[in-house]
Amino acid sequence: MRKTVFVLLLLLMVLPAPARRKPRYPFIRADLNVLQTPGGESPELQHFFRKLDTLLITGRGDVRVLHVGGSHVQGGTLSDRLRRHFLSLRYGMEGGRGLVFPFSAAGTNTPVSYSSSWQGNWESATCLKPADEELGLTGMAVMARDTSAKVILDLVPRERQLLQQRYVFNRVDVLGSGTLEPILLLNGRDTLRGIGTENLRHFDIPYYTDWIQLAFTGQGRYSLRGLYLDKPYGGFSLSEAGVNGASTHSWLRCGLWEQEMHRVMPDLVIFSIGINDIQGDDFDARRFKGNYRELIKRVRRVNPRCAILFSGINDSWRHRAVNRHTEAAEKAFRELAQEFDAAFWDWYGVMGGAGSMAKWEEAGLAQADKIHFTPAGYKLVGDLLFDALMDAYYGR
């Protein structure tokens, strides 16, 4: 029996790496599609890879990724593409769905991988400007003023695919605070009360589900900063935290960001913040790096062995011309990667460099604003980034 198990494990270890996709577009620089580690081999990235080894070979363990950014992340297509690629590496290794937020109650778009709806009276706050509300890992909050407020979260993706991944959970952590008490309505009617602290309420649902309805009881108000959906066993999970228009300075406004990151405890944080930092006339690379230093310190205080991956930023246009700050930001990313033993993916270079956003637009991959991508474009970016990650993983 032991010999059989050993042979099976050995076969898993020598399986060939997934075939790299050949770029269908001549403007993509496949030769640049690698993870750069300017500071030399990253111990934290190697630790992440070893945890992934354990999960892929034995089916055991817990691997968690957090993707942080602006509208590129809030839209959800890029993050979900990465999530699906990781889960395709081994059947049945999906962990909990992770961090979610009722974006519809805030009057903004929900990531494509789930849907949200709301009832009652809600107000909202984001990290884009100073707010009276405490903000955390999602960078947003919605405030319930009375018991008429309800939200429903459904994990069935709005974008249906042939091989549909189904995410189920039976553990819910509600991130928020207030005098109203959050409750779950099971099957739309039975009340489930949670336990917890001032800033977190934990619920154990007696069955697996892919949707929940959150309501409130009592008097007063409640500030809801997000929910974490999980299972009692391990696996791979990727949580996204994206706020349209958010810059590095925006995320520093989130005073509970570090505290709530303990709930995710990421092994890898992918930072896709930067495109909004370069939209003004006064981009300051030193300030940009200083903001990132503080964000990274907060991550490493939660998990000192957490790997950091800077995705860089894409080519973009401003005032009908190529944004001249992009290359300065790219240089800053490389310097940060060297300073923190992090990895850097040259999104700007891989997509074709200066002016390439116009070519992506012509190919139906970018929007007319030459800042954002189409769904097909975000999927392609996800494919390219995942290929670079897997080349680094299998090329050790």
Regions found by a protein language model. Give the residues of each.
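Catalytic His-Asp segment of secreted/periplasmic serine-dependent ester chemistry enzymes
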Residues: 315-396
